[in-house]
UniProtKB/Swiss-Prot annotation:
Signal peptide: 1-23
Chain positions found as Phenylalanine amide: 79
Keyword Transmembrane helix tagged: no
Record keywords, A-Z: Amidation, Ion channel impairing toxin, Secreted, Signal, Toxin, Voltage-gated sodium channel impairing toxin
GO molecular function terms listed in the Swiss-Prot or TrEMBL record: sodium channel regulator activity; toxin activity
Tissues in which the protein is found: Expressed by the venom gland.
Protein family membership: Belongs to the formicidae venom clade 1 family.
Residues cleaved off as propeptide: 24-57
Protein name per UniProt: Myrmicitoxin(1)-Pr1a
Length: 80
């Protein structure tokens, strides 16, 4: 049974288009997500530092409770 040349060409074209799609930087959201996670972690760390500098006792505890999940998410994403 002979396979038509058009089928070979179609398989090669589909394979190449798929590999080119993965090679584009738009298909890689990891760098964008990493930059966003880093910016979020830095902003939350600044918010925690500001809250710790204030004399009210409840705010540092509240700030730590809010910031810790973001720091955990950043560290797991970076080193996990």
């Amino acid at each position: 049974m002979e396979i038509p040349k058009l089928l070979y060409i179609a398989v090669i074209a589909i394979g190449l288009s798929g590999s080119l799609t993965w090679a584009t930087p738009l298909a890689n959201p990891l760098a964008e997500a990493e930059a966003e996670a880093k910016a979020t972690a830095e902003a939350t760390a600044e918010a925690l530092a500001e809250a710790l500098a204030e004399p009210e006792p409840g705010l540092p505890i509240l700030a730590a409770a809010v910031v810790i999940p973001f720091i955990h998410h950043y560290l797991v994403g970076k080193f996990g």
